[in-house]
Structures are given as C-alpha cells and as structure tokens.
Amino acid sequence: PFIGTNPNLAWTHTYNFPDLIDVYQMEIHSKKKNYYKYDHEWKKFEISRAKLKVKLNNGLVIPLRKKILWSEYGPVLKNDSGVFSFHLSALENISAIEQWYQMNKAENFEDFKRALKIMGIPRFNIVYADKQDNIFYMSNALIPLRDTIYNWELTLPGNSSKTKTKGYY
C-alpha cells in the first residue's frame, strides 16, 4: 500500500475497481493493414517503434524492435482474434507524482482537498486523518461518460466516434 505521513496528517490508499478500460475491435482495411475505419473514413494508425531488451532465464539479453500502433482510442494490440484498441483514462493523465507530492506537503485538510483536485490517481480509495480530528474516506475514480446505447462491458465497435468516451464524471 501507499502511505504518506507528515507532522500534521496521514493518508493511505486501497485499490478500488472502477471500470476504467474500454476495448474496441478495429475494422482493418483489406489491403492497407495500417489503416482502420473510423466514421466512414480510412485512417492510418499512428506508428512508432520501440527498442526493447528481453532478458532470458540464462541471462542472455536479446534486443527486440517492436512496431507500436495508436488509434483514435489509444494503443493497439493484434492477436489471433483480431485487432483491438483500448482506452484507459490513466494514459491521459500523468500527474500522479505531483498529486502524491502535494498530498504529502499538505498541512491541513483544505490543502489535502486541493491536492485531490489534481485527479492523478483515479483508481485508488483514499483514507485520511489529521491532528485536528478530521477523518476522510473517498472512493476515487475518473468514470468515463459513455453513450448508454452500448454495452460497455463487452468489446465495442472501433469504427465510430459514437463509441469514444465523452469526458469523465
């Protein structure tokens, strides 16, 4: 667990389980494999390359180059079932370190609440107590705004902006 303390307050996290990930099955062009259908148009995936080092059990390190694809929704994965993209709110917000820093520097509950407004750690419950006898619990999440005509527990069609989340609660 994450725990923070200073002379004035203490806080900790437990993990909560909000539904933060959406998976989309992409429709790939039959001849141009780096293109996918989106709103009746063929769009090219953003393509980058990563250099990885894979260490084997015997200590041998093998360099690997991997092509990385990105769609309107986010990163793309290919497997035997098709091509899928996923959206995760955490990929849009990289301010967790800043929030934890501000939480640790808080001198009172008002400072702590200001740190929480950063919303950099949307998948943790937060428990807080201070020397002024304040006790606080929050089940924290950035829940995507989703169109109710889709079943978001299933894989979604990746060919329409209608399935893209529209912000957060």
Regions found by a protein language model. Give the residues of each.
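Mature extracytoplasmic enzyme cores
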Residues: 1-169
